[in-house]
Amino acid sequence: MTNIRKTHPLIKIVNHSFIDLPTPSNISAWWNFGSLLGLCLITQILTGLFLAMHYTSDTTTAFSSVTHICRDVNYGWLIRYIHANGASMFFICLYLHVGRGLYYGSYTYFETWNIGVILLFTIMATAFMGYVLPWGQMSFWGATVITNLLSAIPYIGTNLVEWIWGGFSVDKATLTRFFAFHFILPFIITALVMIHLLFLHETGSNNPSGLISDSDKIPFHPYFTIKDILGALLLILTLMLLVLFSPDLLGDPDNYTPANPLNTPPHIKPEWYFLFAYAILRSIPNKLGGVLALVFSILILMLFPILHTSKQRGMMFRPLSQCLFWILAADLFTLTWIGGQPVEHPFIIIGQTASILYFTIILIILPLVSMLENKLLKW
């Protein structure tokens, strides 16, 4: 009798994706983040579901319902903090996953890469809407500032903002619809993840050398299931250390003050994982220009396959490109730091310099250096 996992219509899909999947034998720990992102997504959906059972999306009771979850619900504080810090872990894994893709040239798989960028946008939208739900000061003012950016769109901007708000300011209608979207989007993300995997399994995984690895593939199970379990344990350990010892480390103290439309916080800033984009937005004095720079700072990822001028796929054997990659990484850390600082000297000029450097490296320097490395190959 043939093995059921190879014949059953449903089980064989799982088999081809996670058990008998031919995998390059030399993939490093940088390839662990895909499975870790899957784990983060499942954790966020489950904790979010339990939070939604007790949360009320009304401006008068939203803040107190979160307090009620933390104080009165069995392990409510744990569920809430796993969900809040789980989002941070999600973004850490996400940025490392994207960084791996850039370093090893995984963006040459067009479909997989583009679906991945769409996923990044969707996850960012979901996280933003989730941050509004506790209805603290930073929730309210963050929602006001970010949604207000859409008013920079010529002609339809103001109408668009009022349509999204459901009125003339961020209020009950806004909170209710944000909760509805925050609930539905993770399921859309799950569907996109399946498409992402579908396209990936059409081509097979990339590997650190960037060479075709068809002649040296091994089954995913048990080799990489064990490796992924190790990664998962380390992720869970990090998350639980964060949740149980310093759950508010990455949050904003202002969000423990109920939303007050009459009192603006001194420094309005988003969660840490949006600070780099926020710094790019603030570095341009013009409103529409800032919004375009903000969108393009993420959308630029879609240009990488077009901007790839090297004859080699990854950066493993390209020291000049490696240097540029790490300068870009340092630049993103600088932007993240600047995004959390007040708008004053010297932070303004540092932010503007870092923003210019970000776009210059990606659009100009990296393609030129790749072409130079092609020339050096002939020597």
Curated annotation (Swiss-Prot):
Cofactor: heme b
Locations listed in the record: Mitochondrion inner membrane
Keyword tags: Electron transport, Heme, Iron, Membrane, Metal-binding, Mitochondrion, Mitochondrion inner membrane, Respiratory chain, Transmembrane, Transmembrane helix, Transport, Ubiquinone
Any Gene Ontology CC annotation: mitochondrial inner membrane
GO BP term, pick one: mitochondrial electron transport, ubiquinol to cytochrome c
Membrane topology listed for this record: Multi-pass membrane protein
CC cofactor note: Binds 2 heme b groups non-covalently.
UniProt binding sites for heme b b562: H83, H182
InterPro entries (alphabetical): Cyt_b/b6_C, Cyt_b/b6_C_sf, Cyt_b/b6_N, Cytb/b6-like_sf, Cytochrome_b, Cytochrome_b_C_euk/bac, Cytochrome_b_N_euk/bac, Di-haem_cyt_TM
Bilayer-crossing regions: 33-53, 77-98, 113-133, 178-198, 226-246, 288-308, 320-340, 347-367
Residues the record lists as binding heme b b566: H97, H196
Keyword rRNA-binding: no
Annotated positions binding a ubiquinone: H201
Molecular functions per Gene Ontology: metal ion binding; ubiquinol-cytochrome-c reductase activity
Pfam families xrefs: Cytochrom_B_C, Cytochrome_B
Origin superkingdom: Eukaryota
Keyword Iron: yes
Family the UniProt entry places it in: Belongs to the cytochrome b family.
Subunit: The cytochrome bc1 complex contains 11 subunits: 3 respiratory subunits (MT-CYB, CYC1 and UQCRFS1), 2 core proteins (UQCRC1 and UQCRC2) and 6 low-molecular weight proteins (UQCRH/QCR6, UQCRB/QCR7, UQCRQ/QCR8, UQCR10/QCR9, UQCR11/QCR10 and a cleavage product of UQCRFS1). This cytochrome bc1 complex then forms a dimer.
Miscellaneous information on this protein: Heme 1 (or BL or b562) is low-potential and absorbs at about 562 nm, and heme 2 (or BH or b566) is high-potential and absorbs at about 566 nm.
Function: Component of the ubiquinol-cytochrome c reductase complex (complex III or cytochrome b-c1 complex) that is part of the mitochondrial respiratory chain. The b-c1 complex mediates electron transfer from ubiquinol to cytochrome c. Contributes to the generation of a proton gradient across the mitochondrial membrane that is then used for ATP synthesis.
Protein's name according to its UniProt entry: Cytochrome b
Record gene name: MT-CYB
